[in-house]
């Protein structure tokens, strides 16, 4: 059997980069300082301190102030994928626009909910706006507009494509025209090294129909299951 040195199929982090000592120290500090709080339920949105930290994280990255009360902690990004799909679904068989090549876990979640998935062709800039517009127009005429558009716009899985700002703005305008929410899964944005990072969809427009998913799995550890909406 061939030995695989680097597995690009699963999005695993390198165990050697796991900050064991730092997390041990942080866990000890939390137990010492917040022992009583740890014995209580954190509320429906999740731990307030963690939500505030993630809000600061997004503000530092996107330059947009985020109200921590608009953040929901999730069990990794995939729970966010499932929760948003469940929340936006009205009936089995509802339509969703997805990228033609899409992360298998997302496809599996949507299949389990009986979504009718319409694939949008990709090129080096991600979802093709012409195809998005064409499908929105067609589905509008058929009176079955998609419940949302799902995209991994930064380091798309499996292609690795990054959608430029101009294209993001185009898709935002199309979605607003038809009243269709955008669900952006930004779980790979932290795997970025050189040059400016393209802005998230929500940072380009204050449309409340935009839903943003993010995760710490790719920069910390998938097993910790830390994500947020």
What do the PLM-derived regions correspond to, one by one?
Residues 4-6, 41, 155, 218, ...:
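Short, flexible coil/turn micro-motifs enriched in small/turn-prone residues
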Residues 1-45, 49, 56:
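N-terminal "arm"/small-domain region of PLP-dependent enzymes with the aminotransferase-like
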Residues 23, 206-229:
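Conserved core segment of the aminotransferase class I/II
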Residues 11-14, 153-156, 218:
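Short glycine-rich anion-binding loops that position phosphate/pyrophosphate groups of nucleotides
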Residues 18-22, 161-162, 194-196, 223-225:
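Short aromatic-enriched loop/helix-cap "lid" or pocket-rim segments at secondary-structure transitions
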Residues 10, 122, 215:
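Active-site donor-binding loop signature of nucleotide-sugar glycosyltransferases
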Residues 32, 37-178, 183, 189-204, ...:
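Conserved core of the PLP fold type I
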């Amino acid at each position: 059997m061939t030995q695989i040195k680097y597995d690009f199929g699963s999005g695993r982090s390198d165990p050697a980069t796991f900050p064991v000592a730092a997390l041990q120290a942080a866990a000890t500090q939390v137990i010492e300082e917040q022992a009583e709080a740890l014995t209580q339920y954190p509320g429906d949105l999740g731990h307030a301190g963690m939500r505030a930290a993630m809000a600061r994280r997004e503000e530092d990255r996107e330059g947009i102030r985020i109200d921590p009360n608009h953040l929901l902690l999730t069990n990794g990004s995939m729970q966010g994928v499932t929760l948003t799909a469940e929340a936006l679904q009205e009936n089995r068989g509802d339509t969703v626009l997805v990228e033609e090549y899409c992360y298998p876990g997302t496809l599996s979640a949507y299949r389990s909910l009986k979504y009718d998935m319409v694939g949008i062709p990709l090129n080096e800039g991600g979802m093709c706006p012409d195809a998005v517009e064409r499908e929105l127009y067609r589905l509008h005429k058929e009176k079955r507009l998609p419940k949302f558009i799902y995209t991994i716009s930064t380091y798309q899985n499996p292609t690795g494509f990054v959608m430029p700002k101009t294209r993001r703005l185009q898709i935002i305008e199309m979605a607003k025209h038809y009243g269709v929410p955008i669900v952006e899964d930004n779980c790979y944005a932290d795997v970025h090294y050189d040059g400016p990072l393209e802005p998230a969809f929500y940072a380009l427009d204050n449309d409340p129909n935009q839903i943003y998913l993010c995760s710490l799995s790719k920069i910390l550890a998938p097993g910790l299951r830390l994500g947020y909406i």
